[in-house]
């Protein structure tokens, strides 16, 4: 019979020699092998049989908590090889579906993969939920963690605990996940296993004896992980006999089938043809397909409580897929409560976006809309700039989110785009008690008294940084220069220092991480979380050319930085403007007061070059006419600024 599992798994010299999976004899097969051997339909039925026979008590849903480059994707690949989901060496970074994820080494969209495991006595169904680690995608992470019972806490043996490890640990711990510490990269010469154990004990208060030292690259000791997952991580709290309740973990748009949703089935069953109801939009959908990720979409006739699986709901508008939404079976939803965790995404970074060539607006608008369909956390609205023409105002979860969006737009559609400097949402408190959130610098008041403003508030973040001992002074100076306030400092083993600062979000989005890397020679790591609003002395800063404000370059800044920043702005922008026939002043205004100014001298045409030296009256007449012409030009003329100048300035080119 197809469902007989193999009894063992052998590792030799760190290389995987055999794999657990479905087998007809002692010879083992991977997913691809079995599809070819027995045919798609028989394979699907065998898969459903196996899932149906596994009790919920034998389900394990888990994630991997790790800092970037600590080996999360490699470890995932080894686990998939161990359980026969993929052939050894056949794929790498299976769970990173997007090109930008593979290139940057980060996870942007939540993914899952199902695995079968047999310990020689009984079958287990495992769901590995791969989540974004960066704070920009933290809302998606919390939904993904809600579908898990535990997580592997991955620490690099050579680098130790890093900022993102700490931030993600606290999020997982706060949600009650059981954590299993894994020390990775023990095959490196620089590996310090005792130091990593000590850090795990002192930083996370976890038992160092529970740490599993592994090498995800070679496969050494990886076979110890799944038995530990089964032993330590609890099965999901679900009931297959209750009415359907499914939590939406993530969604994406497929050009062939439309919206695909990743869901955690908390109660009941879902099958093809079922009519489901959204708890938050009250819309109904006919389920076109259900299945598991194994590792790609594998259709099944049903999915049941405890599973993390995909559905194709026949949804026409992808923006109706709200992460954290609850779905019921139509007609069996009376008295059911939505699952906790729904929250509308709140953009924290806003940019203006304009096509490099204004003629491309219509084509790029379609491309922009298509990309936004894949990421509901992006807000999009059209806007017009007197400097750059038609464009959009985009809202993102953070600066990394904005950078990833721009990169995907350029790589997937070949679009060339100009992004203005990032801004954050400021809060204005009026004297009558009203509050207003401003996300566009153009809408920020020019004069506090004139607009009856009581005070301004700006958002802050708590930044968590890990740096080597020798660079602590440099980092403290950087934080001080960016208006940071120190909250905590902790000296870790392995020569690392953990710093916590509260920093204005506006300073963070101005390439703070790049500066941090620069002052530590690339050895620092950073993570952060929102820390609320604080009262602040912030002002609107307008760059004017020939007296006309350039709205694409308007920004909001703290008053203490205005003078220096203003001088830098006008000096740098002057470099990108060509000479005109009249004198052009470039000024920086704050509350209608000029705080910095540069002037581009006028081109001078020698109108007297063909005159005879003795013709004085003619000489004076031509000069007078030229002078009068310049007066008229000054009254009616406008300075033409090419898009290249804005692009170079916003890219901070010299």
UniProtKB/Swiss-Prot annotation:
Domain of life: Eukaryota
Keyword tags: GTP-binding, Hydrolase, Membrane, Mitochondrion, Mitochondrion inner membrane, Nucleotide-binding, Protein biosynthesis
GO BP term, pick one: translation
Residue ranges occupied by any tr-type G domain in the UniProt entry: 57-237
Residues the entry annotates as binding GTP: 66-73, 130-134, 184-187
The protein's enzyme class: hydrolase
Pfam families per the UniProt record, alphabetical: EFG_C, GTP_EFTU, GTP_EFTU_D2, LepA_C
Compartments, as annotated in UniProt: Mitochondrion inner membrane
Protein topology in the membrane: Peripheral membrane protein
Catalytic activity: GTP + H2O = GDP + phosphate + H(+)
Keyword Membrane: yes
Recorded GO CC terms: mitochondrial inner membrane; mitochondrial matrix
Family: Belongs to the TRAFAC class translation factor GTPase superfamily. Classic translation factor GTPase family. LepA subfamily.
HAMAP family: LepA
This protein's name: Translation factor GUF1, mitochondrial
Organism: Candida albicans (strain WO-1)
């Amino acid at each position: 019979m197809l469902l007989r599992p193999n009894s063992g798994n052998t590792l030799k010299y760190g290389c995987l020699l055999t794999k657990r999976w479905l087998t007809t004899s002692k010879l083992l097969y991977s997913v691809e092998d079995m599809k070819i051997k027995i045919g798609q339909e028989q394979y699907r039925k065998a898969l459903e049989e196996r899932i149906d026979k596994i009790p919920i008590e034998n389900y394990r849903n888990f994630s991997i908590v790790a800092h970037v480059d600590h080996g999360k994707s490699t470890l995932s690949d080894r686990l998939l090889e161990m359980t026969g989901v993929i052939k050894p060496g056949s794929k790498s970074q299976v769970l990173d579906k997007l090109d930008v994820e593979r290139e940057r080494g980060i996870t942007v969209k939540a993914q899952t993969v199902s695995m079968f495991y047999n310990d020689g006595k009984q079958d287990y169904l495992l769901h590995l939920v791969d989540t974004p680690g960066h704070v920009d995608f933290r809302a998606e992470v919390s939904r993904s963690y809600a579908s898990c019972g535990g997580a592997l806490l991955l620490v690099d043996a050579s680098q130790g605990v890093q900022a993102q490890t700490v931030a993600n640990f606290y999020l997982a711990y706060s949600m009650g996940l059981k954590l299993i510490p894994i020390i990775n990269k023990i095959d490196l010469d620089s590996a310090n296993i005792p130091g990593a154990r000590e850090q795990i004990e002192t930083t996370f208060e976890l038992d160092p004896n529970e740490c599993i030292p592994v090498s995800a690259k070679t496969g050494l000791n990886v076979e110890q992980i799944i038995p530990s997952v089964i032993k330590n991580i609890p099965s999901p709290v679900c009931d297959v006999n209750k009415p359907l309740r499914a939590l939406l973990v993530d969604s994406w748009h497929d050009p062939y089938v439309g919206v695909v949703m990743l869901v955690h089935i908390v109660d009941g069953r879902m099958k093809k043809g079922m009519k489901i109801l959204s708890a938050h939009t009250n819309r109904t959908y006919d389920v076109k397909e259900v299945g598991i990720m194994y590792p790609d979409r594998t259709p099944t006739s049903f999915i049941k409580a405890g599973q993390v699986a995909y559905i194709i709901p026949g949804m026409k508008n992808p923006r109706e897929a709200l992460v954290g939404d609850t779905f019921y079976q139509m007609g069996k939803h009376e008295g059911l409560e939505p699952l906790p965790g729904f929250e509308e995404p709140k953009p924290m970074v806003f940019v203006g976006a304009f096509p490099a060539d204004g003629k491309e607006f219509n084509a790029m608008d379609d491309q922009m809309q298509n990309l936004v369909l894949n990421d509901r956390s992006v807000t999009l609205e059209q806007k017009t700039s007197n400097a750059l023409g038609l464009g959009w105002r985009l809202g993102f979860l953070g600066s990394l989110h904005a950078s990833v969006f721009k990169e995907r737009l350029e790589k997937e559609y070949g679009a060339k785009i100009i992004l203005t400097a990032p801004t954050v949402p400021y809060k204005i408190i009026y004297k009558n008690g009203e509050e207003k959130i401003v996300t566009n610098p153009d809408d920020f008041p020019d004069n506090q008294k004139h607009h009856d403003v009581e005070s301004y508030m700006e958002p802050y973040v708590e930044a968590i940084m890990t740096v080597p001992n020798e660079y602590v002074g440099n980092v403290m100076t950087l934080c001080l220069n960016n208006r940071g306030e120190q909250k905590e400092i902790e000296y870790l083993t392995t020569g690392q220092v953990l710093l916590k600062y509260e920093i204005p979000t506006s300073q963070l989005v101005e390439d703070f991480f790049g500066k941090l890397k620069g002052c530590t020679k690339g050895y620092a790591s950073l993570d952060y979380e929102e820390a609320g609003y604080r009262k602040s002395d912030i002002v609107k800063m307008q760059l004017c050319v020939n007296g006309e404000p350039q709205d694409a370059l308007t920004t909001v800044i703290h008053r203490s930085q205005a003078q220096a920043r203003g001088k830098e702005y006008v000096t740098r922008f002057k470099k990108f403007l060509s000479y005109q026939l009249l004198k052009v002043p470039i000024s920086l205004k704050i509350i209608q007061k000029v705080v910095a100014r540069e002037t581009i001298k006028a081109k001078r045409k020698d109108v007297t070059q063909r005159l005879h030296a003795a013709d004085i009256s003619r000489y004076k007449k031509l000069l007078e006419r030229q002078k009068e012409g310049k007066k008229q030009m000054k009254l009616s003329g406008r300075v033409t600024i090419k898009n290249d100048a804005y692009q170079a300035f916003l890219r901070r080119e010299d």
